Design a protein with these regions (language model features):
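Helical scaffold of the NTase/Pol beta-like nucleotidyltransferase catalytic core
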Residues: 174-197, 227-230, 429
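GNAT-family acyltransferases
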Residues: 1-105, 154-173
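Conserved GNAT acetyl-CoA-binding A-motif
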Residues: 126-136
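Catalytic metal-binding acidic patch
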Residues: 196-236, 251-256
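Conserved beta-strand-loop-alpha-helix junction that forms the acyl-donor binding cleft
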Residues: 104, 135-145
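Nucleotidyltransferase catalytic cores
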Residues: 300, 304-429
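Conserved acetyl-CoA-binding loop-helix of GNAT-fold acetyltransferases
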Residues: 109-123, 145-150
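Conserved NTP/Mg2+-binding pocket subregion across the NTase superfamily
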Residues: 229-339, 343, 352
């Protein structure tokens, strides 16, 4: 069982701990070798002096200054020991908070860093109203990179070997909901040895609130019982009862079944969550797109990773499913409804073309941008508009001009589908 941590704003008398870790070469080794132009920095060790005569000014600047800045010690609750420090401060020009975390050397590699970083993010987003939190450091610091990614950050950009990582307010609350959902599912299935996966737009950094789903797959070693299935099938609604304003629980979709049934496609006790509802059924299968996403980009949320028992789809499988999408587009998208989801047909076509050309799967947004960059779309204005709406759907959900346009997309979708048809035919030839 992981030890619990908490954050503690130090009293003035407790600043000796900060002085101690700032002067510890093992703790500060990550900081050595730089040309930093400020008093008290030791380039050879990375240590920074923190003499007592500086404490009063430092304390006035950092403590009690929310929401501009926040500083705290990391506390191990089992014995009350301080094990490091965290801080955030506002960067008004960038519109985000910069952050820092230092874990005392002797407490590293014990699983504390991710937990401490999550506590800092919780404070920043839930107490300080942060819109985003940012950090940057050398990409070669692989342990630090993984700590940030595990806590929910995404790669923002890279320049001259410096990696910038960012987590937005939306990402934080979505990931918090994912953690709560994962915990709830794992408790219900505690005796079934579940492996819980996240795949799709959330792991491809393409989730957009108001449009996207949160795709999960739960594979168990032991068959799900009827009482468990009854509890799972209404779990989204039960969580919403306790958190009515949560914007994410209703977005969860996927299937829960035994690994053996998922592999064999045999009948099983299956819990299915979809856009239009939920049910207990007897089968659940992936198409080649979902399987490729799961195997190449999926994230294990809980349990043992069993993906080595799954097979990566071949090009022929991807071709078959692209063709199925194409046939649906010809059948169902001759005319379109007054909803921005009608833009999804254009994104589906773009992803199909990308997949046929590249032999793999990417996010719909990335595929559409790739198609535009390669001048493969005969109706670029339509696809550009689809991308604009996809990237910020909540801003356009009540836009009458956009909604009126969605009713007229049929001919443009079919013109774009002509390109997909040519791609399919060229591969046959």
């Amino acid at each position: 069982m992981k030890e619990s941590l908490s954050l503690h704003v130090p009293t003035y008398k407790e600043l000796g701990y900060r002085q101690k870790i700032m002067q510890d070469p093992d703790t500060m080794s990550y900081n050595k070798g730089y040309d930093l132009n400020f008093d008290g920095y030791d380039k050879s060790t990375g240590c920074i002096s923190f003499p007592k005569h500086e404490w009063a000014d430092w304390y006035t600047y950092f403590i009690g200054q929310e929401p501009r800045r926040f500083y705290a010690y990391i506390v191990r609750e089992s014995d009350g020991k301080f094990i490091g420090e965290v801080n955030v401060h506002m960067n008004a020009d960038a519109g985000w908070y910069e952050m820092g975390i230092v874990l005392e050397a002797k407490y590293r590699s014990k699983g504390y860093a991710v937990a401490a970083l999550r506590l800092l993010l919780q404070h920043a987003f839930e107490k300080m109203g942060a819109e985003a939190v940012h950090n940057e450091f050398e990409e070669e610091r692989s342990a630090a990179v993984q700590t940030h990614l595990s806590a929910g950050f995404t790669r923002h950009r890279k320049e001259n070997g410096i990696l910038e990582l960012l987590i937005t307010r939306e990402q934080y609350f979505r990931q918090k909901s994912i953690l709560i959902m994962t915990s709830a599912i794992s408790k219900i299935l505690a005796d079934n040895q579940p492996s819980i996966y996240l795949y799709g737009s959330s792991v491809l950094n393409d989730f957009r609130l108001g449009w996207s789903d949160i795709d999960i797959l739960v594979l168990t070693q032991k068959r799900i019982s009827q009482p468990q299935a009854q509890e799972l099938v209404i779990l989204r609604q039960k969580l919403l009862e306790n958190e009515a304003d949560n914007a994410y629980y209703r977005s969860f979709e996927g299937g829960m079944l035994t690994l053996s049934a998922f592999l064999s496609k045999e009948s099983d006790c299956v819990v299915y969550w979809g856009t239009s509802g939920q049910r207990i059924t007897n089968t659940y299968q992936f198409d080649s797109f979902c399987m490729t996403e799961l195997l190449q980009n999926g994230k294990l949320l809980y349990g043992l990773d069993v993906r080595s028992q799954l097979k990566l789809p071949k090009y022929a499988d991807l071709y078959r499913d692209v063709k199925k999408h194409y046939e649906s587009i010809r059948k169902y998208a001759q005319t379109t409804e007054r909803t921005f989801y009608s833009f999804g047909w254009l994104l589906d076509i773009a992803r199909g073309i990308y997949t046929l050309r590249n032999g793999t799967v990417t996010s719909k947004t990335s595929a559409a941008q790739w198609v535009l960059n390669n001048n493969l779309c005969p109706v670029p204005v339509a696809l550009e508009t689809a991308l604009k709406v996809r990237r910020n759907p909540l801003a356009y959900r009540n836009d009458s001009d956009i909604l009126n346009y969605t009713e007229t997309l049929g001919p443009e979708i079919q013109r774009f589908a002509d390109v997909l048809e040519e791609e399919l035919d060229s591969i046959i030839r």
